[in-house]
């Protein structure tokens, strides 16, 4: 909402500066976006009158004018196409300073002396018209300072209103707010009823009373739309960012800005029969005032005559029924359209108008009569004409009704944290036009006026009190609570620490959307039922993710498309899994790896990352909380992963994650031309560990045995290591697999595993007999349980 400060001060004028007024409005929730001066900075410009003009002797497009400033006559050379005798214009005399630090001096133009300058609106930065002189009213006082005459010491204030404050989309609404804020008197213009001088009416039928509970119409004959709109009205419209069109349209716009009631004027000659307010017929055509032809839907309310639609109700009129310079008789409409019926209709047709903006937010349903009389009076004053009687159709049962609200002083104190005197509460609320009746000490019955659609609960009234009292005046009270450090389990790892661990291993953290494309959901979780959003941001963000992989792989694609050949990313976030008893939101930690094992450098090659490189990163994460031994990697199957390079990660038999390469078919579908490895872990399992225990360091030598074992190809290395641990005794300090071989010299159905075992006794030196006996027990158990033998 943009308005003139002087226009507002004509209604209510607290004794405060512009800056203070703007700050107070913003603090009251009516946020001021901008303040723009009504004109540029200039001086020495007065109202001048062109007495005569003659052709310049040496220039076809220049005229030599005699201009009066009320006391003297000056010769001025002017090239404006609209200069003519009798015209009153802004006259910049010698010594005047125009915007841009442009000083007016005596000059010669093509040999003819010029003593001043006749100005356009653009040259004064008082409008956009640059195609001719700014034409002033015929009764403009010659010689008066133009800033005084046009009230240019003004500013346009633009307020960014929230959707619930449709009552402030007018000067009347803003004046009501300012009056309540400053306890200042609001002077509302007296609108007198216009007496009918003829009895012509057009019958009105409201066939959709729920959508249009109130409709008023009036015939005004013999208007003269060739008469110009008064300059004072044009200026107020300009400062409200509304362009002047013709007197009828300007007046309806002016009343809408002044009172908040949209109006529309139809050319009476284009109305066949009477007015019908009805729902459109499916596919019905209408050419709008902007020249756009629309195909109407059956849920759209229209204003029609007995033959065709004339306008989309509350949005825009039709071209064929709009007023023109040749219009002699008009039908003036003032109506209340239901908010729900109008909401969204303009956008659905690609439109947004001042009228639809107001109706969508709510218009005072008791305002239509006053607006009709106000517009009629202005029309008769400016364009002449004869007014007929007002015809009104009302469906009382469909008009809005707001129940009274009970307000308690105790609740006000509880929510705002301060005591406001009862008399002050009543004053503040009455200033907004609310009817307040005391029911008991500290309790009131509040009748909500028709212009406030956003007040229905006690908390709404308390919000109004806070706004008017001043948010900046509310006392600051800190929470009264005993603060204590939050306990943290020692045997756990924090997510920030896990993040730092992965960053130290060369990963970068990514943050992706929790919403993904349903097609991607199907790619990574085929057969699973996605959780679809009722109102998604877009079609490709319509499903909740059941895994963090889709977002990470999409981020990987983004990087690969930008020549980033080595990518290592991780993300922590929620996955969403539907269950019979509701929605499960589970924190996860996931990663994606692609490209070379090490960054490019002179000291290392460009070997590609493989499964075991990523497994090492996962083991570092699993071991962070000190419980790596509780996790096992077993061959697994996942629809999104390579069937031969997939590990299922378990802890005490529970699945806690997966690790593997993206399935070749999925890689092909996604356009990935190189191996991509991913992992995903349940964050709660990763974060829970075991408190480490101190063991005294042994001073005695270690004993190591390396075993080369032959095992069937389908026997996992972890199974071999588990059997070794079970039989190696309590003094085993280290066990590691350091080689796997398949090929020449080995049965094609077998593989060779090389493991290293290290023992160390805490209090003595182990002898060979003890170690050999333990080694023999290990080999015997391996052969019996896994058919694994010592390689010879």
Swiss-Prot record:
Keyword terms of this UniProt record: Aminoacyl-tRNA synthetase, ATP-binding, Cytoplasm, Ligase, Magnesium, Metal-binding, Nucleotide-binding, Protein biosynthesis, RNA-binding, tRNA-binding
Catalytic activity annotation: tRNA(Phe) + L-phenylalanine + ATP = L-phenylalanyl-tRNA(Phe) + AMP + diphosphate + H(+)
Biological process annotations from GO: phenylalanyl-tRNA aminoacylation
Segments forming domain FDX-ACB: 698-791
Subcellular location: Cytoplasm
Positions of the B5 domain: 400-476
SMART domains recorded: B3_4, B5, FDX-ACB
Domain tRNA-binding: 39-147
EC number, UniProt record: 6.1.1.20
Cofactor comment text: Binds 2 magnesium ions per tetramer.
Name this protein carries in UniProt: Phenylalanine--tRNA ligase beta subunit
Species of provenance: Pseudomonas syringae pv. syringae (strain B728a)
């Amino acid at each position: 909402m943009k308005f003139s400060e002087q226009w507002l001060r004509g209604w209510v004028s607290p004794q405060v500066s512009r800056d203070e007024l703007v700050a107070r409005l913003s603090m009251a929730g009516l946020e001021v976006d901008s303040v723009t001066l009504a004109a540029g900075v200039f001086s020495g410009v007065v109202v001048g009158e062109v007495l005569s003009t003659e052709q310049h002797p040496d220039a076809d497009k220049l005229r030599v004018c005699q201009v009066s400033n009320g006391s003297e006559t000056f010769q001025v050379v002017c090239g404006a196409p609209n200069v003519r005798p009798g015209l009153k214009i802004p006259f910049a005399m010698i010594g005047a300073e125009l915007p841009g630090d442009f000083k007016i001096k005596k000059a010669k133009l093509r040999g003819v002396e010029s003593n001043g300058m006749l100005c356009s609106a653009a040259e004064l930065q008082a409008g956009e018209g640059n195609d001719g002189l700014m034409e002033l009213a015929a009764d403009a006082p010659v010689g008066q300072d133009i800033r005084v005459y046009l009230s240019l010491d003004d500013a346009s204030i633009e307020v960014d209103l929230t959707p619930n404050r449709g009552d402030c989309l007018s000067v009347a609404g803003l004046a009501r707010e300012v009056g309540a804020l400053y306890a200042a008197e609001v002077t509302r213009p007296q609108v007198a009823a216009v007496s009918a001088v003829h009895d012509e009416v057009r019958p009105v039928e409201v066939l959709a009373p729920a959508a249009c509970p109130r409709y008023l119409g009036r015939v005004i004959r013999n208007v003269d739309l060739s008469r110009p709109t008064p300059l004072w009205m044009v200026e107020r419209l300009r400062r409200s960012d509304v362009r002047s069109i013709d007197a009828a349209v300007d007046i309806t716009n002016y009343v809408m800005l002044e009172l908040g009631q949209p109006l529309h004027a139809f050319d009476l000659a284009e109305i066949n029969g009477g007015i019908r307010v009805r729902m459109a017929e499916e596919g019905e055509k209408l050419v709008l005032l902007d020249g756009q032809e629309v195909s109407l839907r059956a849920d759209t309310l229209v204003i029609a005559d007995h033959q065709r639609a004339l306008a989309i109700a509350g949005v825009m009129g039709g071209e064929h029924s709009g007023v023109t310079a040749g219009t002699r008789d008009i039908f003036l409409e003032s109506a209340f359209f239901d908010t729900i019926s109008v909401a969204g209709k303009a956008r659905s047709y690609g439109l947004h108008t001042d009228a639809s903006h107001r109706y969508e937010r709510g218009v005072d349903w008791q305002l239509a009569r006053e607006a009709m009389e106000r517009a009629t009076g202005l029309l008769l004053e400016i364009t002449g004409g004869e007014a007929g009687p007002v015809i009104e159709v009302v469906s009382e049962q469909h008009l809005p009704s707001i129940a009274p609200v009970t307000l308690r002083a105790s609740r006000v104190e509880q929510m705002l944290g301060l005591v406001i005197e009862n008399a002050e509460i009543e004053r503040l609320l009455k200033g907004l036009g609310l009817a307040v009746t005391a029911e008991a000490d500290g309790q009131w019955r509040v009748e909500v006026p028709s212009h406030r659609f956003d007040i229905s609960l006690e908390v709404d009234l308390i919000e109004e009190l806070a706004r008017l009292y001043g948010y900046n005046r509310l006392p600051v009270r800190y929470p009264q609570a005993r603060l204590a450090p939050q306990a943290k389990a020692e045997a756990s790892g924090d997510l920030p620490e896990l993040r730092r661990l992965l960053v130290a291993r060369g990963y970068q953290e990514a943050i992706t959307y929790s919403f993904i494309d349903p097609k991607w959901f199907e790619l990574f979780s085929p057969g699973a039922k996605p959780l679809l959003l009722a109102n998604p941001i877009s079609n490709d963000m319509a499903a909740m993710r059941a895994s963090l992989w889709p977002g990470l792989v999409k981020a990987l694609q983004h990087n690969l498309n930008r020549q980033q050949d080595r990518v290592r990313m991780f993300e922590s976030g929620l996955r969403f899994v539907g269950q019979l008893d509701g929605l499960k939101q589970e924190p996860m930690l996931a990663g994606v790896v692609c490209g070379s094992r090490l960054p490019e450098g002179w000291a290392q090659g460009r070997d590609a990352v493989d499964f075991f490189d990523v497994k090492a990163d996962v083991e570092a994460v699993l071991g962070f909380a000190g419980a790596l031994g509780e996790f096992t990697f077993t061959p697994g199957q996942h629809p999104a992963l390579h069937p031969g390079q997939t590990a299922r990660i378990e802890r005490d038999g529970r699945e806690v994650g997966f690790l593997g390469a993206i399935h070749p078919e999925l890689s092909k579908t996604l356009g990935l031309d190189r191996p991509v490895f991913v992992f995903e872990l349940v964050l709660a399992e990763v974060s829970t560990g075991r408190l480490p225990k101190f063991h005294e360091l042994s001073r005695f030598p270690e004993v190591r045995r390396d075993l080369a074992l032959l095992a069937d190809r389908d026997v996992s290395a972890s199974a071999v290591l588990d059997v070794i641990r079970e039989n190696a005794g309590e003094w085993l300090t280290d066990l590691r697999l350091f080689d796997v071989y398949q090929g020449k010299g080995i049965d094609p159905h077998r593989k060779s595993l090389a493991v290293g075992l290290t023992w160390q006794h805490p209090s003595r030196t182990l002898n060979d007999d003890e170690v050999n006996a333990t080694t023999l027990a290990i080999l015997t158990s391996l052969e019996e349980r896994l058919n694994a033998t010592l390689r010879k």
